[in-house]
Amino acid sequence: MSFDISQFPVLAQANTPDELRQLPQAVLPQLADELRGFLLKSVGKSSGHFASGLGTVELTVAIHYVYNTPFDRLIWDVGHQAYPHKILTGRRERMHTIRQKGGVHPFPWREESEYDTFSVGHSGTSVSAALAMAVAAEKEQAGRKVVSVIGDGAMTGGMVFEAMNHAGDLHNDMLVILNDNEMSISENVGALNNHLAQLMSGRFYTTIRENSKKVLKGMPVIKEMAKRTEEHLKGMVVPGTMFEELGFNYIGPIDGHDVDALVETLRNMRNLSGPQILHIMTKKGRGYEPAEKDPIGWHAVPKFDPSTFEKPASKPSDPTFSQVFGKWLCDVAEKDEKLLAITPAMREGSGMVEFSQRFPKQYFDAAIAEQHAVTLGAGFACEGYTPVVAIYSTFLQRGYDQLIHDVALQKLPVVFAIDRGGIVGADGPTHQGAFDLSFMRTVPNMVIMAPSDENECRQMLYTGYCYKAGPTAVRYPRGSATGAKQVETMTALPIGKGLIKRQGQKIAILNFGTTLANSLVAAEAFDATVADMRFVKPLDVDLIKELAETHDVLVTVEENAIMGGAGSGVLELLQTLKLPKPVLQIGLPDEFIKHGAPDEIISELRLDAAGIEKQIADYLA
C-alpha cells in the first residue's frame, strides 16, 4: 500500500533531509501541512502512535532544515513523537508497515537508519546520550552539532536532571529541545516571546553576554549584579531559572508550530557555545480535532478513517487483565481506605481510571519516575498502609535497585501488579516483558505469582494484599483475558502451592502463567500431566518432587526469558533434591524479541499450542 505522492507536491521533493535543505524556506509551512496530512493517512492505514507525532511536525521540519543530519546528531527521547522524522528520512514509502512484523520500527532504531543515532523506547535517555556525543565531537574536533528532543513528560525522570547537571558542569556544546505539550499555547508564547527568543539566541546578544563574563570575571560584585539583571529580564517572560541553575542557557518558550520562528531560532542557537535549552510549546494531536481534544485517547490508535473523525468501535471481548486489576482495586478500596495505588504515569494503560476517580485520596501518579514510585510504596508500607504499585514489566526494570534495597531488604509488604508480562507485540524489544521473572526470582523475601487466567489473577492480587511478611508480585500479560468465570469472593491462596490440571503419564508439563491453555492442548498429543504452578517463588517443592519421581520427562513452560526464569528455578530445585531428571525448558530465547503482532510472535517462538507440542516432540525424538 502506498499513497499518491502527487497529493503532497512539496513533501514529494523532500524524501531525505538533504532534499529538504534544498527547498526555499518560504515553502516550509506548506511542507509541514503536507507532512501532517501524510501522517494522518499513514497511521490511519497502519495503526500506531499518533497524537505525539502530529505535535512535532514543524519542529521536525525545522531541525532537519537547519542541522546537517545525519552528520549532526539528532536524538529523540522515547520516540512516540518521531514519526515525522521517519517520514523525512527515507522511510516514507514504508510507513504503512510501521509496528508490523518486518516493517518500520515503532521507535528510532540505529539498525534501521543512519538518521536514528540512538535507539530509544524508554523515556529520559536522550540527554545522557547527547552529552556523550557532544563530548566525543569535541574530542574529535569534528565540528558536528548534537540535538536531543525531549517531551515534558520525560522531564519528571531523575535521569534527565542527572544528565543536565553533568552537562552544565562539562559545558560542551549541545542543544536540548524541551517539547512542552501538556498545555495549549499560552498567551506569552506569541510575537513578543518569539522575538525575545530570537534576540537572546542571536549573535549580538550572546557575544556581549560572553565578553561581559570575561570582563567582569575579576569584579565579582558587579558580575553578580549583571547576572541578576539578566535573569530578571528573562524571568519577566520565561520560566527558565531552573535550567540556568543547572548550567544551561535557556531560550523560550516559543510557539512550536511556527516553523519560520523555529528555523530562525535554531539558526541562531546552532553556533552558541555550551549547553543550550530551547523550550517550545506544542499541542498533541495538532491539526486533527479529535486528537487535540483527547490526546491521551489518541496517543496510539488502531487503523481508522481520518475523514470520520472517530476511532472504530472496539469489538466486544473479554475484559483485559488490566481491567480485571482495576476492578479488583476498586473492590478492595471500598472496604479498606489504607489501600493505596501507585502508578508511574500509566493510569489508562494499567486500568486505573475508575479507581483514580472514585478514590482520589488513595491514588498516586508518580509520573515517569519508576524508581520514585517503588520507594514511595516502600515508605507507605512503613507507615502501615498497603501500597499496590501498578507497573509494566519493562518499566519495573528501571526500579530494580529500589525493589531490592528499599522493599525486599526491609521485608515491606508492597504489592507489585506487573502488567505487560511476556510478549506485548508492536512496541518491540524495548517493551517486551521478557525479564521480570528472571530478575525478581533472585531477590530474597519476594513472593512471585503468575496467574493462568483472570480469576486466578484476582485471587493472587488478594493473596498479595493479605500477605504481610514481605513484598509480592502478580505478573500478568497485556490484552484480553481468557474468558474464565470470575469468582467474586476473594480467597488468599496458600503460598507456594500449585494445582494438577490434567493427569497423564510419563511427561509432566509445569506451566507458569497464561500459557496454561496452550500447554493443556499440547498435552493431549502425549497424554501428559499438566500442572498450573501458580507460584514462581516459592516453588511448590512437594509437587515438583512428586512429578519428578512419577514421570520420565519434565517440561517447563513460561512466557519469560528461559535464562534465569521459572524453568531455571525448577532445575535448581531438582539439583538440590538430588533428583536428576530430563527437563525441557520452553520460553523466550536469549535474544531481544522484535516487533510484530503478539499472535505472530508467539507462533514464531513456538509458544502456541502447536509450537509447544512440536518442541516436546523434537526433544523426545
UniProtKB/Swiss-Prot annotation:
Cofactor binding, per record: Binds 1 Mg(2+) ion per subunit.
Q: Which domain of life is it from?
A: Bacteria
The record's Gene Ontology cellular component field reads:
cytosol
Q: Which Pfam family name is an example for this entry?
A: Transketolase_C
Write the record's keywords in alphabetical order, separated by commas.
Answer: Isoprene biosynthesis, Magnesium, Metal-binding, Thiamine biosynthesis, Thiamine pyrophosphate, Transferase
Q: What Gene3D superfamilies is this protein classified in? A: 3.40.50.920, 3.40.50.970
**What's an example of a GO molecular-function annotation for this chain?**
thiamine pyrophosphate binding
Q: Has the keyword Iron been applied to this entry?
A: no
Identify which cofactors the protein needs according to its UniProt entry. Mg(2+); thiamine diphosphate
Look up keyword Magnesium and say if it applies. Answer: yes
Identify the pathway: Metabolic intermediate biosynthesis; 1-deoxy-D-xylulose 5-phosphate biosynthesis; 1-deoxy-D-xylulose 5-phosphate from D-glyceraldehyde 3-phosphate and pyruvate: step 1/1
Please name the CDD domains in this protein's record: TPP_DXS, TPP_PYR_DXS_TK_like
The reaction(s) this protein catalyses = D-glyceraldehyde 3-phosphate + pyruvate + H(+) = 1-deoxy-D-xylulose 5-phosphate + CO2
List of residues binding thiamine diphosphate: 80, 121-123, 153-154, 181, 288, 370
Documented EC number(s)? 2.2.1.7
Q: Where does Mg(2+) bind?
A: 152, 181
Single biological process term from Gene Ontology: isopentenyl diphosphate biosynthetic process, methylerythritol 4-phosphate pathway
Matching NCBIfam families, A to Z?
A: dxs (TIGR00204), PRK05444.2-2 (NF003933)
- Give the protein's biological function: Catalyzes the acyloin condensation reaction between C atoms 2 and 3 of pyruvate and glyceraldehyde 3-phosphate to yield 1-deoxy-D-xylulose-5-phosphate (DXP).
Known partners and oligomeric status = Homodimer.
Family statement: Belongs to the transketolase family. DXPS subfamily.
Q: Tell me the protein's name.
A: 1-deoxy-D-xylulose-5-phosphate synthase
